[in-house]
């Protein structure tokens, strides 16, 4: 195999691999079952606790909305909105830097950060629901 052909194949392989790091932006939305309803204040507390656990910084708290941001390794920045009610919440992309956002696609690490945050919020809500069920008076 000629060295020119080999170099071309290696370049194509590297470009293909580099293109795989960009994925569609992950926006999550969850409706809680009727048995798991919480107060808006409790929903906000669970969301803020999950943000703190994952080292996101809360920028602004307002009724039914939390704005947060994260900077990783002093370079990679992402900002999100979390809208919530007593029975639902949604995490949506707001802004980013150095994560290659373009045409609704972004570096896969952003999606990983949002996915882990989402998992922690759900876990916090589950824990709260279990604790509430255990402390409710039995008939």
Predicted regions located by residue number:
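Bacterial N-terminal signal peptides that target proteins for export
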Residues: 1-8
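Hydrophobic alpha-helical targeting segments used for export or membrane insertion
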Residues: 9-14
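C-terminal motif of bacterial Sec signal peptides marking the signal peptidase cleavage site
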Residues: 16-19
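Ser/Thr-rich, low-complexity intrinsically disordered terminal regions
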Residues: 21-139
